[in-house]
Structures are given as structure tokens and as C-alpha cells.
């Protein structure tokens, strides 16, 4: 097994070295191909690709090769999407070939990388980046030449779309056809990456580092294997990229990031700066809503008009952002919410960040983001299942039996509240004298959840300081609620509540609550007056679990045991009440 792992590591290292030879460490240009919405012969919006008609044997060969490649790579592409890829990529390959020959370039020094994707908004598009790397050529001249190439490519595709558009709209007047072509040239399927120069007040082609763009941006996408998924369908560079698996892409991306980890967090690279293009058109399938580009629609003099609605610009995240996002994902996956958690579970990353400028601040920011993300996206039950490894639960079941509790019913009660399906009842109250296991169970649940906070009753002015953005809150040996009984009722009522915290902004409390107490907490003393006015509202928000039998567990119980036990729950919540006799073994005496 060890030898197989070594062989696999060597293979990936060789693959990484070979891929770096194919993708040069230099700058080129990048653009998107996007399907544009226009009107068909019935004045209805369409994204249909113009018919692929050509007398060029080279272009026909490119069409066939692209279709064969895409059909073999992914079965979730529609015929129209395949035709769009054939048209755009086929014209690109043919035009590159002509450009290389006319400029007498060495074709082996041309880098073209493309990737067909569907974004989170389900918009179909193709990423392309192109570079030419020859020591005998002036890089500035090469960039200008590549800029001219993109203009030519944009115009060629605009001509195809415009002619098709005019034909189906029966636009025959030369002047109207010229106007239509102008619109397609200005806002057609080709979208170069641009930046705005504040001095000249003009847009220029944005230089893109090919390796960074490929390894960091393109390789971060997952391959699409369902129709509703976002990610990439296929990718290629006429070499290794064509045949990489999703797992290999992720591994190579990590190797590239690790190679540059020395300056990855503070690199002076910001791809967002001035990145104002390409812009994605928010297109729908209804002729009565905002659709496509107004210039294209109006140029055809159709009855359908619309405003240009633009979504957010396509942005290329920086290395700094990618590294931070990678760290945040790792914290989420292993469950790190405090510096202590990170020291134990992600010690290398903690040490690396702590030695950087503003390192402690970065660490605290990432940990806070993970607290917010986890408490918002998943429940305490999900945390227990996600962050722990299963262990034999027999010692836990024996302890629960010794406490006089029915483990099957207790499991249903706990899971109903931990999944926040208990309605207004969002608090578990373990009640009983010392030595009965109430703190043992509460501590086990909180430690298994990992993202938990403690109610600091020692500071009555700010008891919730540690409770913001936690999946579960623990009030240990809770006595009198006093002046914060109203906050407690709001928090245990099942809603998200914001409360004041010491030295911080008001924080959102989203988690369920566990209380351990050997006194009757429904009797509240405010000042010198004890009152039962809050008793009924508190009972409506809590389920009381009486722990009356003294126990002496001889085996340590762990979060892994709790996961094994709770994971056998049938995922069906039950109706809860304040007192539930079904929780206890034998006849209740209270």
C-alpha cells in the first residue's frame, strides 16, 4: 500500500512538471464566449446557435474534432451548447492557425487553454486564455498582436450571428444590416477581459498570468455530472489538460498553491482591481421580461424591447483570496472554531499564519467567519455527525440506562431539538442533584457539536458574550436568570436573536440551548422579589429531563459514541412537552 502511494505521488509530480512545461509562466490574454439572447423569426427570445455552414475543410475538421471530444467528455451538454462550442472554439482554432502563419510564429510556443462551464446562475459560457512565449519576440508586441487577434475573432463571430439574425428577421436593407452588425460587434458572444485606465479613461485588454489562471481559477471547478450542477463540462489545451480527472486537477492545483505558499497570503496581486469586464448579461426565456441586450433587440425594429440588465462582472480572485478561502474550507471541514481548535487540528496552518504580518488578526477573522458559516448552514445535529468519528456506543448506552433514562426516547427528544425542529421548544434542561450525570451528558453534547458557547453567569451584565454564532449554548449550573430572563426566553423560543456582548457588536444567537441545574430555574428572582410570572413561558420553551439516579461510570464516554448513537435516529421529529414520562425507565415518582 505504501509503495502504491509513493508511485502515485511520483506520477502526480511528473504530471505536474510536464503540465508546467505545457503552460508557460507568463502573461497572455483571456476572454469569455457567452450565449447571447436575440429574437427569432416569431420575435421570441432565443439563444440558438447559427447553423454551422462552411466550405472550409479545415473548419469542418475542427467542428468534427470538437464534437467528438465534447461527446466523449460529458453527456450533460445539449445539442445547442455543443453547436455553440463547435462554432466558437472552431473559429478560434482556425483563426489562431492563420495568425501564427501570418506572423511566422512557432506554433509549439502558442498556449491556448479553454474550459466549458456553467455558472451558479446556470449561464453557459466558455473560458479561453491565449499566450505566445518566444524569447526572440518583444512581449509588448506579442500582447498587441493578441489584442488584434481578439478583435478579429470577435468580428468574425459577430458577422455570423448578425447575418443569421438579419436573415430570420428578414432585414434586407444594407444600412439596417450594418447597424445590426455594429451592435453584435459591440456586444456579441466574445467578451475580452478588460481594465479601465484612469488616466486615459479607456478600456484595455487585461494581461492574464496563464499558470495562475489555469491552476488557481480553472482547476478549482468541479466536473458537472448532473444537469442542475455548476462547474465545468470539459477543458483542454491540446495536451495534458484534455485528459485530467477532477481529482488530478484538484491535486495539481494544491501542488501549485503549496509551491507558492511563501508569499501567497501577501502577494501584491489583485485581479479585481479595475476588472470591469466581461459582464454577464442576465438573460431569461420570456419575451415580456428584461432579456438580452437592448441594442440588439432595438436594431431589429421588433415589437419586443428590453433594458440591458447586467449582472456582476466576471472577476478573477487573487492568490490571497484563494489561499484564505482554502483555509476557511479546511476549518469548516475539520471543525475549527477557536484558536485552540486550530492549534490541535490545523497546527501547520496556524503556525504559518501566526508568523505573518497581522497573523493573529487573520486567524481570528477566519475563525469568526467559520463560526458564522457553520451556525448558519448546518444544525448542531449535523455538526455532531460531521466533526466526529464513530465509536462503539455501548458504554454510553449503559450510562444512560444507569441514569434511569429510556435511550430510544431520549435520542428522539435530543435530535428533535438539535435539528431545531422542536418549534418554540428550543432548550434541554437537565435537572437533578449532583453526581447524576446531567453535566456529563451536557458536556458530551457540546463537545461533540464543537461549535458551542458558554453562558457566563459570572458577568450578569453580559452573559451572552461567548454565545454569538454558535450551534449550541450551554448554561452550566444555571441558578437565577434574574435580569436576563427576557433574553433567555427570546433565545430559547426558536428564533434568531441579537443580544449585546462585551466589547463586541451585538451578535446573532442561533443555536439551541442546554441548561444544567439542581434548582428550579422557572422561579425567577428580580431584585429581591421571587416571581412565578415567567414559569409558564419558560416551561413552553424547555423540555425537562430529570436526572435523579447517582451514577459512577467506569468507562469514558466520547463524542464518537454520541455520533454512533444519534446517527441511528430515524430523522422523524416528535411532539415535545415540558414533562415527558416516556423518557424514564420504570414508573415516575414525580
UniProtKB/Swiss-Prot annotation:
It comes from the Viruses. Changing residue 285 to E: More than 99% loss of viral replication efficiency. ATP binds at residues 432-439. Its cofactor is Mg(2+). Its EC number is 3.1.21.-, 3.6.4.12. Its main location: host cell. The record marks 227-228, 285-286 as: Cleavage. The gene is NS1. One of its GO terms (biological process) is DNA replication. It comes from Aleutian mink disease parvovirus (strain G). Homooligomer. A motif (RCR-3) lies at residues 217-221. Residues 405-560 form the SF3 helicase domain. This is Initiator protein NS1. It catalyses: ATP + H2O = ADP + phosphate + H(+). The endonuclease active site can probably bind other divalent cations. Belongs to the parvoviruses initiator protein NS1 family. A divalent metal cation binds at residues 117, 125, 127. Multifunctional protein which displays endonuclease and helicase activities required for initiating and directing viral DNA replication. Also plays a role in viral packaging and transactivation of several promoters. Binds site-specifically to 2-3 approximate tandem copies within the origins of replication (Ori), unwinds this hairpin region and nicks one DNA strand thereby initiating the rolling circle replication (RCR). Changing residue 227 to E: Complete loss of viral replication competency. Gene3D superfamilies: P-loop containing nucleotide triphosphate hydrolases. A motif (RCR-2) lies at residues 125-127. One of its GO terms (molecular function) is ATP hydrolysis activity. Keywords: ATP-binding, Covalent protein-DNA linkage, DNA replication, DNA-binding, Endonuclease, Helicase, Host nucleus, Hydrolase, Magnesium, Metal-binding, Nuclease, Nucleotide-binding, Transcription, Transcription regulation, Viral DNA replication, Viral genome packaging, Viral release from host cell.
Amino acid at each position: 500500500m505504501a509503495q502504491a502511494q509513493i508511485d502515485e505521488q511520483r506520477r502526480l509530480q511528473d504530471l505536474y512538471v510536464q503540465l508546467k512545461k505545457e503552460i508557460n509562466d507568463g502573461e497572455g490574454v483571456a476572454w469569455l464566449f457567452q450565449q447571447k439572447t436575440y429574437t427569432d423569426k416569431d420575435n421570441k427570445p432565443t439563444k440558438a446557435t447559427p447553423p454551422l455552414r462552411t466550405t472550409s475543410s479545415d473548419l469542418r475538421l475542427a467542428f468534427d474534432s470538437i464534437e467528438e471530444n465534447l461527446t466523449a467528455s460529458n453527456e450533460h451538454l445539449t445539442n445547442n451548447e455543443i453547436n455553440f462550442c463547435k462554432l466558437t472554439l472552431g473559429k478560434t482554432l482556425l483563426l489562431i492557425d492563420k495568425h501564427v502563419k501570418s506572423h511566422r510564429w512557432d506554433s509549439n510556443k502558442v498556449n491556448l487553454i479553454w474550459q466549458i462551464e456553467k455558472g451558479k446562475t446556470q449561464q453557459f459560457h466558455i473560458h479561453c486564455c491565449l499566450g505566445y512565449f518566444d524569447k526572440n519576440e518583444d512581449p509588448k508586441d506579442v500582447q498587441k498582436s493578441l489584442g488584434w487577434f481578439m478583435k478579429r475573432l470577435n468580428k468574425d463571430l459577430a458577422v455570423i450571428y448578425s447575418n443569421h439574425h438579419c436573415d430570420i428577421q428578414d432585414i434586407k436593407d444594407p444600412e439596417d444590416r450594418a447597424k445590426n452588425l455594429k451592435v453584435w460587434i459591440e456586444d456579441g458572444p466574445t467578451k475580452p477581459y478588460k481594465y479601465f485606465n484612469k488616466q486615459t479613461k479607456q478600456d484595455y485588454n487585461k494581461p492574464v498570468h496563464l499558470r495562475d489562471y489555469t491552476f488557481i481559477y480553472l482547476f478549482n471547478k468541479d466536473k458537472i455530472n448532473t444537469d442542475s450542477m455548476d462547474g465545468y463540462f470539459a477543458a483542454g489545451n491540446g495536451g495534458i489538460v484534455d485528459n485530467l480527472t477532477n481529482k488530478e486537477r484538484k491535486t495539481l492545483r494544491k501542488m501549485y498553491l503549496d509551491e507558492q505558499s511563501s508569499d501567497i497570503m501577501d502577494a501584491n496581486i489583485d485581479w479585481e482591481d479595475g476588472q470591469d469586464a466581461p459582464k454577464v448579461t442576465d438573460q431569461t426565456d420570456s419575451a415580456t421580461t428584461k432579456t438580452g441586450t437592448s441594442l440588439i433587440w432595438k436594431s431589429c425594429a421588433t415589437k419586443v424591447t428590453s433594458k440591458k440588465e447586467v449582472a456582476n462582472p466576471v472577476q478573477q480572485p487573487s492568490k490571497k483570496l484563494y489561499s484564505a478561502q482554502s483555509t476557511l474550507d479546511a476549518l469548516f471541514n475539520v471543525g475549527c472554531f477557536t484558536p485552540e481548535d486550530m492549534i490541535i487540528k490545523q497546527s501547520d496552518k496556524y503556525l504559518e499564519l501566526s508568523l505573518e504580518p497581522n497573523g493573529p488578526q487573520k486567524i481570528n477573522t477566519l475563525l469568526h467567519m467559520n463560526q458564522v458559516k457553520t451556525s448558519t448552514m448546518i444544525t448542531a445535529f449535523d455538526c455532531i455527525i460531521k466533526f466526529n468519528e464513530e465509536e462503539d456506543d455501548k458504554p454510553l448506552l449503559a450510562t444512560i440506562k444507569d441514569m434511569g433514562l429510556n435511550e430510544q426516547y431520549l435520542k428522539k427528544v435530543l435530535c428533535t431539538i438539535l435539528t431545531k425542529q422542536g418549534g418554540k421548544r428550543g432548550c434541554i434542561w437537565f435537572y437533578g442533584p449532583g453526581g447524576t450525570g446531567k453535566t456529563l451528558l451536557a458536556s458530551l453534547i457540546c463537545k461533540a457539536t464543537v461549535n458551542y458557547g458558554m453562558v457566563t453567569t459570572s458577568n450578569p451584565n453580559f452573559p451572552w458574550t461567548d454565545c454569538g454564532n454558535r450551534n449550541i449554548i450551554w448554561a452550566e449550573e444555571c441558578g437565577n436568570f434574574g435580569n436576563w430572563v427576557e433574553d433567555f426566553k427570546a433565545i430559547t423560543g426558536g428564533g434568531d436573536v441579537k443580544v449585546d456582548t462585551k466589547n463586541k457588536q451585538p451578535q446573532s444567537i442561533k443555536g439551541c440551548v442546554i441548561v444544567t441545574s439542581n434548582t428550579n430555574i422557572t422561579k425567577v428572582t428580580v431584585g429581591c422579589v421571587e416571581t412565578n410570572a415567567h414559569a409558564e413561558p419558560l416551561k413552553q420553551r424547555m423540555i425537562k429531563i430529570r436526572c435523579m439516579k447517582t451514577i459512577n461510570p467506569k468507562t469514558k464516554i466520547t463524542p464518537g459514541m454520541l455520533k454512533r448513537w444519534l446517527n441511528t435516529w430515524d430523522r422523524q421529529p416528535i411532539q415535545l412537552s415540558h414533562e415527558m414520562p416516556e423518557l424514564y425507565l420504570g414508573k415516575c415518582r414525580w
